């Protein structure tokens, strides 16, 4: 869990996301409140629940990216789900409790990776012994083993093929659903696990290079040193206290005030979300998880529906409202150059692998931003995603012939942009007349 201050969290988000100061401020405060809650005594901490956030703004302005970067920064279990993927309990489809189950699985992976790092030195030594066994046999003399160990550490044997025994996860027999029980959770039996425990762990022989054998062997040896029950307990605790759920397309399940009749994927899903966001206990195959302290960030464009079209109870469970503004031409220009992994840096890096040097002039960047802004205004406003369309069209010819142009330096200016992307603008004018 990070102990960054809100100001530090915002400056960290600024490295990757342009603008949207209000949204960054809201999520920074929400993350800091988690740290503050940890400083309280247990009785008071139990009463402090996260203030869930509703982000309102057009597509492509940074709603998802802000949440994703926040979770990465916090090292927290994070899951992004589309609200439209779920159906009301009792109908065919995924029910909303699957969100909590998936969050536990993500938390288990995070905890397992952390604990693997703690035992990596021991696991590496054990993996090294298994590679030496595969090279010279388990009954070889100590002198022979030491000789091969030195060559192994020096990297002389990296490209040599070895046969190693790895645990077989049993892909053939996986899961059995128990009728009447929730899918993907407590109502699922892993037949492979049962048979594995009854008849001992199955192994399979795999042939690979020495340098490629280390990773699976280290993971296998590390898992032998870990306590699965402790990992599960820690993961459930992590998911309960630090979990972040990003509910996208929340506006698509808001029934418009002028709509008539019920809808399985709308009001019913909203009703099912109420206890999950408010705080409930969900049964998973790893144990029960309480959702009281999980942070929910809902987002939607709300082009057709309005936030007030959602159930009043659901509105009340999303008390913090943040409006994200549409991107201007100046914002699009900043997005092209300012983030650490901006689009221009990505394309320059990709083509540099072929020996092609790309150089973008300032007027080219201005022209790209103007084109993207014009497309958004005239066709459909898809925000920063429009830049990907424009950039891909711009470097299409260079990308196709890059392997034949190694060593060349190519300067992209405003004229080059007009020549290669200008046709898109003409086609866009006609697109509205095509069915």
UniProtKB/Swiss-Prot annotation:
UniProt superkingdom: Bacteria
Subcellular localization, as worded in the UniProt entry:
Cytoplasm
Q: Where does ATP bind?
A: 18, 60-65, 248, 313, 385
GO cellular component annotations of the record: HslUV protease complex
A biological-process GO annotation: protein unfolding
For molecular function, the Gene Ontology terms on record are:
ATP binding; ATP hydrolysis activity; peptidase activity; proteasome-activating activity
Q: Which SUPFAM superfamilies match?
A: P-loop containing nucleoside triphosphate hydrolases
Tell me which UniProt keywords the record has, alphabetically.
ATP-binding, Chaperone, Cytoplasm, Nucleotide-binding, Stress response
Q: By its UniProt entry, which SMART domains does this protein fall under? A: AAA, ClpB_D2-small
Write out the similarity annotation. Belongs to the ClpX chaperone family. HslU subfamily.
* Assembly and binders: A double ring-shaped homohexamer of HslV is capped on each side by a ring-shaped HslU homohexamer. The assembly of the HslU/HslV complex is dependent on binding of ATP.
* PANTHER family with a match to the protein in the record: ATP-DEPENDENT CLP PROTEASE ATP-BINDING SUBUNIT CLPX-LIKE, MITOCHONDRIAL-RELATED (PTHR48102), ATP-DEPENDENT PROTEASE ATPASE SUBUNIT HSLU (PTHR48102:SF3)
What role does it play? ATPase subunit of a proteasome-like degradation complex; this subunit has chaperone activity. The binding of ATP and its subsequent hydrolysis by HslU are essential for unfolding of protein substrates subsequently hydrolyzed by HslV. HslU recognizes the N-terminal part of its protein substrates and unfolds these before they are guided to HslV for hydrolysis.
Descriptive protein name = ATP-dependent protease ATPase subunit HslU
The top of its lineage is: Bacteria, Pseudomonadati, Pseudomonadota, Alphaproteobacteria, Maricaulales
């Amino acid at each position: 869990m990070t102990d960054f201050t809100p100001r530090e969290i915002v400056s960290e988000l600024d490295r990757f996301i342009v603008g949207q100061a209000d949204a960054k401020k809201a999520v920074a405060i929400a993350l800091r409140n988690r740290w503050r809650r940890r400083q309280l005594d247990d009785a008071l901490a139990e009463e402090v629940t996260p203030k869930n956030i509703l982000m309102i703004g057009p597509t492509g302005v940074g709603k998802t990216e802000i949440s994703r970067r926040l979770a990465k920064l916090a090292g927290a279990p994070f899951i992004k789900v589309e609200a439209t993927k779920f159906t009301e309990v009792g109908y065919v489809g995924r029910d909303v409790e699957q969100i909590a189950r998936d969050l536990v699985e993500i938390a288990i992976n995070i905890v397992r990776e952390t604990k693997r790092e703690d035992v990596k030195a021991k696991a590496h030594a054990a993996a090294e012994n298994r590679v030496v066994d595969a090279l010279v046999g388990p009954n070889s003399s100590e002198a022979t083993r030491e000789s091969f160990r030195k060559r192994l550490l020096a990297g002389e044997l990296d490209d040599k093929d070895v046969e190693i025994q790895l645990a077989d996860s049993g892909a053939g027999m996986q899961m059995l659903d128990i009728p009447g029980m929730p899918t993907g959770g407590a109502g699922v039996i892993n037949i492979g696990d049962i048979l594995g425990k009854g008849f001992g762990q199955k192994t399979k022989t795999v042939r690979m290079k020495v340098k490629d054998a280390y990773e699976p062997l280290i993971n296998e040896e590390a898992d032998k040193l870990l306590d699965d029950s402790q990992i599960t307990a820690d993961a459930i605790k992590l998911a309960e206290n630090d979990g972040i759920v990003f509910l996208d397309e929340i506006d698509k399940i808001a029934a418009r005030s002028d709509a008539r009749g019920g809808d399985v994927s709308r009001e019913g899903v909203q009703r099912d979300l109420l206890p999950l966001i408010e705080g409930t206990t969900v049964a998973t195959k790893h144990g029960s998880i309480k959702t009281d302290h999980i942070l929910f960030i809902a987002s939607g464009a709300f082009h057709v529906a309005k936030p007030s079209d959602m159930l009043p109870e659901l509105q009340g469970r999303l008390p913090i409202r943040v409006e994200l503004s549409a991107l201007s031409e100046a914002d699009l220009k900043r997005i092209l150059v300012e983030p650490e992994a901006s689009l221009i840096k990505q394309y320059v890096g990709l083509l540099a692998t072929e020996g092609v040097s790309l150089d973008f002039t300032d007027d080219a960047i201005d022209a790209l931003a103007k084109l993207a802004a014009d497309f958004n205004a005239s066709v459909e406003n898809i925000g920063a995603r429009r830049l990907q369309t424009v950039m891909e069209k711009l470097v299409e010819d260079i990308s196709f012939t890059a392997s034949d142009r190694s060593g060349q330096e190519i300067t992209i200016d405003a004229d080059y942009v007009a020549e290669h992307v200008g046709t898109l603008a003409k086609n866009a004018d006609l697109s509205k007349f095509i069915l």
